């Protein structure tokens, strides 16, 4: 099926290429069974690609690819447009969107404050609304960041995000454990 449909890993994408490839594959098959349980465990550790950030442009491109492929896949299901939107944003798209936003304050961004605001303001409002509606954060800091993203409070988001990132770095430096 992969060779017949010439399904390839996306070129130039630094993160999520396996996810994008998977959705391209799903869009070519004719029968899919969806389960309510998650049988996929991501082993998150320091230094893994999943915990590293790339440029905003690279992260945003990954998000747009994910959104496009998920929308195409979910569009094949016999569900209402509202359910389609929920399925798209609850399954991986929200996480990928949050990475775009986080990369602007995660300590790897070389952009000045004005450029960061400009990039955030360039994202369509509907993305922020769908993210806020369907993303389910765990813990206070995630809930706070989600609130700031949903309501497009960019100045507070960049400030709060930077504080959280510096606090996490400080905890690692001193070897703080709970």
Please tell me what each predicted stretch does.
Residues 4, 24, 69-72, 172:
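Residue-level signal for well-ordered alpha-helical scaffold segments within enzymatic catalytic domains
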Residues 37-46, 52-81, 95-128:
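Catalytic core of nucleotide-sugar-dependent glycosyltransferases
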Residues 13, 29, 34-35, 47-52, ...:
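Gram-positive cell-envelope targeting signals
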Residues 105-178:
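Membrane-interface aromatic/basic loop that binds lipid-linked glycans or pyrophosphate carriers
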Residues 1-55:
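Conserved nucleotide-sugar donor-binding catalytic segment
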Residues 23, 91-94:
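Non-catalytic, well-ordered alpha-helical scaffold segments
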Residues 81-91:
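All-alpha amphipathic helical-bundle segments outside canonical DNA-binding/catalytic cores
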Residues 19, 56-61, 86-87:
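Amphipathic, non-membrane alpha-helical segments in soluble helical-bundle scaffolds
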């Amino acid at each position: 099926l992969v060779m017949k449909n010439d399904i390839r890993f996306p070129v130039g994408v630094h993160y999520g290429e396996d996810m994008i490839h998977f959705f391209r594959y799903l869009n070519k098959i004719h029968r899919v069974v969806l389960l309510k349980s998650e049988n996929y465990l991501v082993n998150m550790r320091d230094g893994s690609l999943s915990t590293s950030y790339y440029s905003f442009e690279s992260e945003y491109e990954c998000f747009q690819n994910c959104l496009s492929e998920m929308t195409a896949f979910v569009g094949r299901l016999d569900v209402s447009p509202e359910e389609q939107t929920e399925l798209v944003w609850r399954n991986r798209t929200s996480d990928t969107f949050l990475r775009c936003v986080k990369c602007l304050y995660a300590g790897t961004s070389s952009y000045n404050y004005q450029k960061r605001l400009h990039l955030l303001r360039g994202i369509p409002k509907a993305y922020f609304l769908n993210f806020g509606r369907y993303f389910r954060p765990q813990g206070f800091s995630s809930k706070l960041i989600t609130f700031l993203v949903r309501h497009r409070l960019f100045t507070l988001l960049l400030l709060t995000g930077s504080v959280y990132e510096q606090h996490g770095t400080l905890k690692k430096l001193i070897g703080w454990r709970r």
